[in-house]
UniProtKB/Swiss-Prot annotation:
InterPro entries: Ribosomal_bL36, Ribosomal_bL36_sp, Ribosomal_L36_bact. Disulfide bonds: none annotated. NCBIfam families: PRK00831.1, rpmJ_bact. It comes from Ehrlichia ruminantium (strain Gardel). The gene is rpmJ. It holds the Pfam family Ribosomal_L36. GO terms for cellular component: ribonucleoprotein complex; ribosome. HAMAP family: Ribosomal_bL36. This is Large ribosomal subunit protein bL36. Belongs to the bacterial ribosomal protein bL36 family. PROSITE patterns: RIBOSOMAL_L36 (PS00828). The keyword Ribonucleoprotein applies.
Amino acid sequence: MKVIGSLKSAKIRDKDCRVVRRKGRIYVINKKNPRFKARQGY
């Protein structure tokens, strides 16, 4: 999982990427290709 400052570039990398909020953090998840996972950094 990558930790990046802005998720805008992460969510447009693949059409199956979804932006999810969990425990106050924002994540990008992708069930079809899990290597696109990312988390907002701050």
